[in-house]
UniProtKB/Swiss-Prot annotation:
It comes from the Eukaryota. This is Photosystem I P700 chlorophyll a apoprotein A2. GO terms for cellular component: chloroplast thylakoid membrane; photosystem I. The gene is psaB. Chlorophyll a B1 binds at residue 654. PsaA and PsaB bind P700, the primary electron donor of photosystem I (PSI), as well as the electron acceptors A0, A1 and FX. PSI is a plastocyanin-ferredoxin oxidoreductase, converting photonic excitation into a charge separation, which transfers an electron from the donor P700 chlorophyll pair to the spectroscopically characterized acceptors A0, A1, FX, FA and FB in turn. Oxidized P700 is reduced on the lumenal side of the thylakoid membrane by plastocyanin.
Amino acid sequence: MALRFPRFSQGLAQDPTTRRIWFGIATAHDFESHDDITEERLYQNIFASHFGQLAIIFLWTSGNLFHVAWQGNFESWVQDPLHVRPIAHAIWDPHFGQPAVEAFTRGGAPGPVNIAYSGVYQWWYTIGLRTNEDLYTGALFLLFLSAISLIAGWLHLQPKWKPSVSWFKNAESRLNHHLSGLFGVSSLAWTGHLVHVAIPGSRGEYVRWNNFLDVLPHPQGLGPLFTGQWNLYAQNPDSSSHLFGTSQGAGTAILTLLGGFHPQTQSLWLTDIAHHHLAIAFIFLVAGHMYRTNFGIGHSMKDLLEAHIPPGGRLGRGHKGLYDTINNSIHFQLGLALASLGVITSLVAQHMYSLPAYAFIAQDFTTQAALYTHHQYIAGFIMTGAFAHGAIFFIRDYNPEQNEDNVLARMLDHKEAIISHLSWASLFLGFHTLGLYVHNDVMLAFGTPEKQILIEPIFAQWIQSAHGKTSYGFDVLLSSTTGPAFNAGRSIWLPGWLNAVNENSNSLFLTIGPGDFLVHHAIALGLHTTTLILVKGALDARGSKLMPDKKDFGYSFPCDGPGRGGTCDISAWDAFYLAVFWMLNTIGWVTFYWHWKHITLWQGNVSQFNESSTYLMGWLRDYLWLNSSQLINGYNPFGMNSLSVWAWMFLFGHLVWATGFMFLISWRGYWQELIETLAWAHERTPLANLIRWRDKPVALSIVQARLVGLAHFSVGYIFTYAAFLIASTSGKFG
């Protein structure tokens, strides 16, 4: 009996129902709630699991490299990146008939293969990899790192190597390690790789370990560094006629500030990228040495925060008490980390397409669409997680005495003002945006399109103009040839930048109009509503006027029983649950907008987006319906094509999504009755009744069923859109 799952909770292990299994899985990673957990063991478990996480990441990336080297066509892709389709891996599928085998045999492969839409080929090519042998070497190296990570994780669980709690709470040393050690040194190392391997590679020079010490990255070597003539490293950059990967038109510069894109690859100049990473390395190496560690010099985080008291008294005691609050709360730290990572991930999505860093990736339209969508959805999940852990912090870790009248306490004190302002903004955006869309729909339905309300986004156009876009006719800042800003940058980075901003073949500063104005406000509605739900969930997590003792019920509770009306659906978990639906909806609008705008740009018919995006029927008919034709007809009685797998996934995604509603709409009683009927039938059926179970089958709890429903809704939603996105883009552009 003692060994029953879950071993970390004796109470659950003795539960006689199937609740034991589901609750066990649900709380397996909630180390804080486990029996006889100590603060020390908590920190050590989390620390060790980080190494496990790293091992999985290294193993996964190793697998990417290995499969492309084994089954891909990297070497032939390198010869002609614009016309050879990159292969991710082979497909072994006994279900394939002859038509399917033919349809999926592409990219010069001997059998059926999957095409890569992840951009790894462009990335590996840009950083200097050229042969399958290079890929195998990389795969082996990552496998080695994976093994090292596993060993490190195991080692730090052994008594001799277990770090103490004080080690984990040494904030200054951690900043030193992360800022200088991880960000600084890795950025410097990456600059080194770009300068020594990638840039020579882009100029036709193959640098590997055997000639690494013989090939000078710059003709003058380290001379200019030691004599202070750093500008020499920027002289003689690659010319605009440079053919990437060859010496034709190549220069000798290694650290430049050219601005704009390489004309052939349509990606940022590698020498600009190296310069950027060197600057980042310098900033982080300095930043990591600003805090007091072993030598008694530098800032103490605690002293900094204690001193942050605004002189006017408007923020009370300012940051007093925050150091201990944050440093002693893992949830607060995780919330901060997730919020930062979520913002960064969304920024990655925006910058990967507008300022592509990898050679030729801008011309691989399906990859561009897939990467944008992928990073935006991940950002959404990470951001909602940040608020979830913020709410858990308020329930489990927040100490009112420690934070009296500081910024954290004051935020809780005026939460009503925060929540009601967010509510007002959401209502305003929602009614006005929907009102405009619906008005325009009615005008089109009644045959008077000229009566639409179309608003030009003049402020956004002015901002684009200030950064150098000339087509709107605002003569301002960088779009004004007489301004000081224009003249200051004219000889350095501006020619490349201005050329890129005003060139209509890339995605930098797309021309915007009334359709963009409307969808921008629809997205703003989604963002504000998602934020409203998340912020309210966190600020009301400890208690509200309706339920002042809420924190005593924990993070996720269904209700406080039948005797106390109105306590259902108000746990912090419920807020997270509701917010995820809004998050998915919002990112749906974001990705619809991005994709439709770009499809029309790539096809050269931007007027379709401009004319149809100002009313809802335009979105439904000219974006969703028009682009789903390949999916709706993916496989039929007359055969199939290479899009059929996406057509199947489109259907399957809808199925998973719809299954979610089965868990979201019906409640426990229905399932409990059904389960008891099925158990009765099972026990009376010959042969079947030979199989017995130890746990009495019971329905999922309300919170669990919501989680299962939410998971199906999310996964189905994303599967459906992924299939639509990849099929509609690759079907048009190959």
